[in-house]
Regions:
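Nucleotide-activated donor-binding/catalytic signature segment of Leloir-type glycosyltransferases, i.e.
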Residues: 242-259
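A conserved mid-protein helix/loop that constitutes part of the nucleotide-sugar donor-binding site
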Residues: 20, 199-222
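An aromatic- and histidine-rich active-site surface loop
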Residues: 69-83, 87-115
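Aromatic "clamp/platform" in nucleotide-sugar-dependent glycosyltransferases that forms part
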Residues: 279
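Short alpha-helical donor nucleotide-sugar binding micro-motif in glycosyltransferases
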Residues: 258-259, 266-271
């Protein structure tokens, strides 16, 4: 079974939830017998052609533009796939690329779409762009042979909105990474950040408005917390928002840029708490990473975060700086206890890979 993945920036170690999803999923599918090729975007990967754990990666030119990048690259990637790769299935990631589901079908390829979240709710998009993304969702549901959705609530909503296509819409979540579970010494904390274990609050993600980091910084400043706030992440395209956010840096508000490997694992494991103040998510991989590392979490009360089913104290009203500030001030008084083993079983990448491979296999006929 030959699969061509389109819609992600690339793998491995490219910033983004979709990219993390694909980096975990496809090597496991290769072990199950799939032949997987990822068509990556040239600015985010090194080399024209290479392999990562059995997954073939081909770099195709992409314009770096907030709106045009995804659409232009997806269009040419589908044509490239049809002419040079000739896959049995095109696996499109996210509803922007899913706009081209009809094109892939017209070219004779079967299509599976993974819906990573209602991107039309993202703050950065104009009303016109939001309509295009909503239309992309409709094209996915209408023309794809199978639609996988990472959020349980979103799966139910799509089945209700498109009852005629409900049978081909399936819930398949993101997974947790077992590599974050083993204990790691605080000596792996980035030395230049001068952090003390259990004396900092952590957040991880791209510096874009829908992640809500501006709320977190404001809430932290308003709180009486004696901890530090560490923000791990960067942005693909520098913007007024990211520049303004970085201006809030102080001795206690630290922008740590991108981190990975043992550094990121140590940052999760030795944090007092992990906070995700997002306005928009699919199923937040960074929250699952924090839980797998044994770090207490505070999450905004948007549906994808509620789907994680953490204790009540773990949630705060999205956009409510005052309520978040109160929680940051009283972390020791909150019940943030999670049964990590339950989550590791529920969000196991091996099982998720098997389920995804089963849906792929079902499209062979």
């Amino acid at each position: 079974m030959k699969i061509c993945a389109i819609g992600l920036r690339g793998i491995p170690d490219v910033m983004g939830g979709i990219e993390s999803h694909c980096q975990q999923l496809y090597p496991k599918m290769v072990k199950n017998g799939a032949d997987v090729t990822v068509i990556a975007r040239s600015p985010y990967v090194e080399g024209k052609k290479y392999e990562y754990q059995g997954v073939k990666v081909i770099s195709l030119w992409a314009i770096q533009h907030t709106l045009l990048e995804t659409f232009v690259h997806t269009f040419f990637a589908i044509l490239y796939a049809r002419i040079f790769i000739r896959p049995d299935i095109v696996h499109l990631h996210a509803i922007g690329p899913a706009l081209f589901s009809p094109l892939a079908r017209l070219l004779g390829m079967k299509v599976m779409v993974t819906h990573h979240g209602a991107d039309y709710n993202r703050q950065k998009w104009s009303p016109f762009a939001k309509k295009i993304l909503k239309f992309g969702e409709k094209m996915a549901v209408t023309f794809a042979n199978r639609v996988l959705v990472v959020g349980r609530t979103l799966t139910s909503a799509l089945r209700e909105e498109y009852p005629s296509y409900a049978e081909k819409i399936s819930f398949v979540p993101n997974g947790m990474l077992p590599r974050f579970t083993g204990e790691i010494s605080s000596s792996h904390l980035p030395s230049e950040l001068e952090l003390t274990p259990q004396h900092y609050i952590l957040t991880v993600g791209r510096l874009v408005p829908e992640k809500g980091f501006h709320d977190l910084v404001e809430a932290f400043v308003q709180s009486n917390s004696k901890l530090k706030l560490v923000i791990v992440g960067d942005t693909d395209h520098h913007s007024a928002y990211s520049n303004t956010l970085r201006e809030a840096a102080t001795d206690n508000v630290i922008f740590a840029n991108r981190r990975g490997g043992d550094e990121l694992k140590a940052l999760y494991q030795h944090a007092k708490a992990f906070v995700l103040p997002s306005y928009h998510e699919g199923l937040p991989i960074v929250a699952l990473e924090a839980i797998s590392a044994g770090c207490p979490v505070l999450l905004s009360d948007i549906s994808p975060n509620i789907d994680i089913e953490a204790p009540k104290d773990c949630y705060f009203p999205v956009g409510n700086v005052y309520e978040l500030s109160k929680k940051l001030s009283g972390l020791d008084e909150l019940n943030l206890t999670l049964n990590r083993s339950d989550y590791l079983e529920k969000y196991d990448w091996e099982s998720i890979s098997d389920v995804t491979f089963g849906y792929v296999d079902g499209l062979k006929a």
